[in-house]
From Swiss-Prot:
Membrane topology: Multi-pass membrane protein
Gene Ontology terms: cellular component: COPII-coated ER to Golgi transport vesicle; endoplasmic reticulum; endoplasmic reticulum membrane; Golgi membrane
Protein name in the entry: Uncharacterized protein C24B11.08c
Record GO biological process: endoplasmic reticulum to Golgi vesicle-mediated transport; intracellular protein transport; retrograde vesicle-mediated transport, Golgi to endoplasmic reticulum
């Protein structure tokens, strides 16, 4: 005798014998359609589970006193590299003058072609005596302002010119300096004055408000005043102007293009026909942290920025675009990037569109709903067909 379990009375899934089951063509069609719908729903849920989305959060920036890297690549088609300088100033008083060690200057022909690097240096050829030792060149009264690595000595034309600039003395004919005459400074400059220049590199600045600028002439700091000797630029007004192309400008380490839009100033082109012109870019820089989905990849701390622009003639007068606005007279021609630092930090986290548990819950719920709906449709259609036959 077969044992009957007492649990049978709790069975909510009652079965019918095989002979009592009826299979119809409409039921088969509904089953196939339901199966396709289930496959589609499961596929959509899987795509949603695997999808990576970005979650943003804004907090007060906890870091302070850090330094920040500025990466740039800018071309000036109508100014030779010889008279362009890159300087950095900030509100703390830090002044980085005529930065060379992290900035490369590439000479360009009037047609924009790169000129051989072998011809780059003007006024930077150190004199060597017959016995192989470096000579101590005359500073022509500016020995107190000689380069730190050669105290009291100006061994190159650049060293003499720098010393005079620091002393705030005017330079007349550079051929009066032996170093400049020996290096054929004037002749080489004459050959280069129709060229253009590309500047690319990296600047390290304090994480505080300040500016970096690219302007003609050697710069000096006279008290609170920042001064450029623009005589070489002004003497060739017909040849020079501040037209420029910003190929790239970013603050901090770069991000992959897949997670970062282009920087606002990338691809900016400005053209002007007069030499006495000044461009200013006012930049608001926000700390930005990118946290990738993979736990094995470290977060990337960098910066994003927004920018507004202003341009004017240093001669002053009314603006062409807005005649009601009057610009003041004065200033230094050049391209100035005034940056300010926001106290906020934006955190962007990559997360899955759903958890695995959520994925399973959604799939099971949709499966149950789809099967139940299909059974209702099949049962209803079957009953209607049966009534028609009767």
């Amino acid at each position: 005798m077969q044992f009957r379990s007492p649990l049978r009375r709790f069975d909510a899934f009652q079965k019918t014998v095989e002979d009592a089951r009826i299979k119809t063509a409409s039921g088969g069609l509904i089953t196939l359609v339901s199966g396709l719908i289930v496959i589609f729903i499961v596929l959509m849920e899987w795509i949603n589970y695997r999808r990576v989305i970005a979650v943003h959060e804004i907090i007060v920036n906890p870091s302070h006193g850090d330094r920040m890297e500025i990466n740039f690549n800018i071309t000036f088609p109508r100014i030779p590299c010889q008279i362009l300088t890159v300087d950095v100033l900030d509100v703390s008083g830090e002044f980085q003058r005529d930065i060379h060690h992290t900035v490369s200057k590439t000479r360009l022909s009037p047609s924009g072609e790169i000129i051989s690097v072998d011809d780059l240096d003007i006024g930077n050829q150190q004199s060597i005596s017959d016995d192989g030792a470096a000579e101590c060149g005359d500073c022509y009264g500016a020995a107190d302002f000689a380069p730190e690595d050669t105290p009291g000595c100006c061994n190159t034309c650049d060293a003499v010119r720098d010393a005079y600039g620091k002393a705030h003395w005017r330079i007349g004919d550079v051929d009066a300096f032996k170093q400049c005459k020996d290096e054929n400074f004037k002749e080489l400059y004459e050959a280069q004055k129709v060229e253009g220049c590309n500047l690319a590199g990296q600047l390290s600045v304090n994480r505080m408000a300040g500016n970096f600028h690219i302007a003609p002439g050697r710069s000096t700091q006279n008290g609170n005043q920042h001064v450029h000797d623009t005589r070489d630029y002004i003497n060739e007004l017909d040849l020079h102007d501040m037209s420029h192309s910003i190929h790239h400008l970013s603050f901090g380490p770069p991000l992959d293009a897949s997670v970062h839009y282009s920087n606002p100033l990338d691809g900016t082109v400005k053209k002007v026909s007069t030499a006495d012109y000044r461009y200013e870019y006012f930049i608001k820089c926000v700390s930005y942290q990118f946290m990738p989905l993979s736990k094995s990849t470290l977060p990337i701390d960098t910066n994003k920025y927004a920018v507004t622009q202003h341009e004017r003639s240093i001669r002053g007068g009314r603006e062409e675009k807005v005649p009601t606005h009057v610009n003041f007279h004065g200033g230094i021609p050049g391209v100035w990037f005034q940056f300010d630092i926001s106290p906020m930090r934006v955190i962007e986290r990559q997360v899955r569109g759903n958890t695995f548990g959520g994925f399973l819950s959604n799939v099971l719920a949709l499966l149950g709903g789809c099967v139940t709906l299909a059974s209702f449709v099949d049962r209803g259609y079957y009953e209607v067909q049966k009534l028609k036959k009767n």
